[in-house]
Amino acid sequence: MKSYTPYFMLLWSAVGIARAAKIIIVPPIMFESHLYIFKTLASALHERGHHTVFLLSEGRDIDPSNHYSLQRYPGIFNSTTSDAFLQSKMRNIFSGRLTAVELVDILDHYTKNCDMMVGNQALIQGLKKEKFDLLLVDPNDMCGFVIAHLLGVKYAVFSTGLWYPAEVGAPAPLAYVPEFNSLLTDRMNFLERMKNTGVYLISRMGVSFLVLPKYERIMQKYNLLPAKSMYDLVHGSSLWMLCTDVALEFPRPTLPNVVYVGGILTKPASPLPEDLQRWVDGAQEHGFVLVSFGAGVKYLSEDIANKLAGALGRLPQKVIWRFSGTKPKNLGNNTKLIEWLPQNDLLGHSNIRAFLSHGGLNSIFETMYHGVPVVGIPLFGDHYDTMTRVQAKGMGILLEWNTVTEGELYDALVKVINNPSYRQRAQKLSEIHKDQPGHPVNRTTYWIDYILRHDGAHHLRSAVHQISFCQYFLLDIAFVLLLGAVALYFIVSYVTKFIYRKVKSLCSRSTHSTVNGHYQNGILNGRYKGNGHIKHEKKVK
């Protein structure tokens, strides 16, 4: 059967470049992996004739490019200080000291940076003069919603994480839709559904009573007009582009203005550098294992590094490990350490047998794209939810960094390497991921063009954002039905009692009016009263 996908993609491209737009992107103040996705997207938008501007703090590292321009501002972080901040939090994670208080501290850094942006009048006035057509918000840092409101520009959400926010408004039955950070699948028993409900309620209360009010106080501080709540701003997004995919995510209800665009960084493997090519080509007998924890490589504790080195050294496969820092003392002879490696190109090599990863979303999509089985040791954020899905789909095994032993790690690696079901599932998920209309980055630019062409595409937005809590859950209908049921109960009860009393009265009168088979009407000696006269009646002998 002839495929028409290339023709559709060509049509999308032709329509998309009909009008060049000015787009501003507000990335999170931390996490370089998020910025890397946005840079890839900016390059794709540039190819379609759009001009993209990044709003970044001074000192934050980013490669120069003619595909985008930069608008700098004095923020709370630069690349060095944000990295130091993350390292301190990661040390607390590995030592078990990351408490709720420190999570609030992370949020405070986000809102302090937002305050610095909103209060910078020179910055804001300069941005207003640019007259942007669209602003892209990463919900990991909700200041983007505030900036969009301040500039009076249309905005859409581009989530660089696995998160499917409840703020989207899509139905999320807790019986089979696992809440973010619940580490649950769509197959839950009673206790798991109880846990899912608890995580959902805590999450909703945290967002409603902690996160959103912090940003609302910033808007009140600077008297942003027209006055709007953060709740309304978050729900006012024209489109939600989520970095997930039907191959990875559990099936769930969604809405027309929600699109899956996970896998933006995926691409075919390119030729390896000559030295690496010789190294992987020499692993034909047993193959090789790739080890990479992404940007988290610098955060690994010495204890975890030693566990990894011990388990990897026992494998018959060769091992190439992206690593920086002090070399583990128990490093095996089969293991090659390297500070940077072409991860995507190694994943696409025919001799690869498994991937040991932290479960970062970008890495998992590259792994899925090439059909490679995974052993994941999540570190923080959405790593846990990502690996939960990988394990549930049969593509890999999830291990907990704080409980895993060297032996358990070795057993998990041996299992995914020697059990063909893991590779088969990985290859099947690769087929599903690729069997969609166009590459994820092309789908993303198509939808961005779509909302630009249709002035925000309000026709895609559900009315769920215009109804109250009581209306959504039909509490008003339930109240009326309950009121009707109560009223009906009292009416039926009253009528029943009334009929009962009448019947009882008639029966009582009938009983007292009949004696020995004769009707007496209450008059002794056989007399009865009729028409006001006393009459006599002969008794029948």
From Swiss-Prot:
Pathway assigned to this chain's UniProt record: Sphingolipid metabolism; galactosylceramide biosynthesis
Reaction(s) the record says it catalyses: an N-acylsphing-4-enine + UDP-alpha-D-galactose = a beta-D-galactosyl-(1<->1')-N-acylsphing-4-enine + UDP + H(+); N-(2-hydroxy-hexanoyl)-sphing-4-enine + UDP-alpha-D-galactose = N-(2-hydroxy-hexanoyl)-beta-D-galactosyl-sphing-4-enine + UDP + H(+); N-(2-hydroxy-hexanoyl)-sphinganine + UDP-alpha-D-galactose = N-(2-hydroxyhexanoyl)-beta-D-galactosylsphinganine + UDP + H(+); an N-acyl-sphingoid base + UDP-alpha-D-galactose = a D-galactosylceramide + UDP + H(+)
TM segment ranges: 472-492
Topology with respect to the bilayer: Single-pass membrane protein
Known glycosylation sites: 78, 333, 442
Tissue: Brain, restricted to the oligodendrocyte-containing cell layers of cerebrum and cerebellum.
Root EC class: transferase
Entry's Gene Ontology cellular component terms: endoplasmic reticulum; membrane
Keyword terms: Endoplasmic reticulum, Glycoprotein, Glycosyltransferase, Lipid metabolism, Membrane, Signal, Sphingolipid metabolism, Transferase, Transmembrane, Transmembrane helix
Gene Ontology biological process terms in this record: cytoskeleton organization; galactosylceramide biosynthetic process; glycosphingolipid biosynthetic process; myelination; neuron projection morphogenesis; paranodal junction assembly; protein localization to paranode region of axon; response to immobilization stress
Molecular-function GO term, any one: UDP-galactose:glucosylceramide beta-1,4-galactosyltransferase activity
Signal peptide: 1-20
Keyword Protein biosynthesis: no
Keyword Glycoprotein: yes
UniProt-annotated location(s): Membrane; Endoplasmic reticulum
Cross-referenced InterPro entries: UDP-glycosyltransferase, UDP_glucos_trans, UDP_glycos_trans_CS
Chief localization: membrane
The EC number(s) this enzyme carries: 2.4.1.47
Family from the record: Belongs to the UDP-glycosyltransferase family.
Protein role: Catalyzes the transfer of galactose to ceramide, a key enzymatic step in the biosynthesis of galactocerebrosides, which are abundant sphingolipids of the myelin membrane of the central nervous system and peripheral nervous system. Galactosylates both hydroxy- and non-hydroxy fatty acid-containing ceramides and diglycerides.
Protein name per its UniProtKB record: 2-hydroxyacylsphingosine 1-beta-galactosyltransferase
Gene that encodes it: Ugt8
